[in-house]
Amino acid sequence: MRPLIVTYAWLLTRLPEAFARLNAALLGQILWLIRGKVIRRNLSKAFPDKDAEWVLRIGRISCRRTAEMGLFSIASPLMSEVEIRDRIVVDESILSPEHGLPPKGTGAVLFVPHFALMEMMTAAPLLRPELAKREWVVVYRPLDQPAAERWVKEARERFGMKLASRREGFARSMKAVREGHVAAILFDQTTQSGSIWQFLGAPCAVTELPGIIAQRFKCPSRIFWADRTDFWRCRLRMEALHATDSIGLTIESNAWLEQKLRSGDDACANWLWAHDRWKHGQHPFKKLGE
């Protein structure tokens, strides 16, 4: 399997970018055929005032951008540092006193939304020396295919970030924050545990994990996301969360995401609508805050 991955990565990085764009379009269409029913349902429930044409357009763009993100994971190990720097911009917000990372020695919890090109966020330590002065621990879900998992994990850890599977992620994230480092955790994935909260007008299961860590160590919390600007190009941004308890942070981060998805079609299409965040919304979990 690995030789096939290497060959495909070589083609993606050596041929004109039109080849990668075409592959993203084709794979996005396949994803739409597989997950289109879920995507249409999610978008229709979240935006009941939008017509079927809008749902179809946003859903298909979201699929293409999801495929684009996956292809970057495959291709990036063969990209030079110069090319990575050319494609990714660090926004001033990441280095600002108000919204950026706190000074070295102070831990931080980063709430990460599942936007297109979030894979490019792993290059942050390469792009600015200030961001490489501390350890980054990122909680993730390993891929099922061993060869693909090794390739993608190596790509994600290439510039210094350390990945921790969900099984060990809580302990390693706690340790990182306690020692003054950074823990990055997806807060908007489907979860089979957690609490129930309204998101885009419907109940869904939300994780309190990042909020629990931030509350435990009384550390700053930030939204950290990749703002897509073009194919395989983005601007990394950060925004401060102001709540200090786990419930407040969970509510605030989800409210931030809801506002972002409602802010325009481009931002809406950047989210991973193919995952069914509302799948467990009717399960007998406790309501957030109870």
Label each residue range with its predicted role.
Residues 31, 60, 100-103, 127, ...:
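Non-catalytic C-terminal accessory region of glycerolipid acyltransferases
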Residues 1-112, 117, 149-154, 160:
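Membrane-anchoring hydrophobic helices of lipid-metabolizing enzymes
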Residues 52, 163, 246-247:
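Flexible, glycine- and charge-enriched loops at secondary-structure boundaries
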Residues 37, 142-146, 204-207:
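Active-site metal-coordination segments of metallo-dependent hydrolases
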Residues 87-91, 145, 163-167, 203-204:
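A conditional alpha-helix N-cap/helix-loop micro-motif detector
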Residues 40-41, 122, 153, 211, ...:
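Short glycine-/small-residue-rich flexible loop motifs, especially phosphate/cofactor-binding loops
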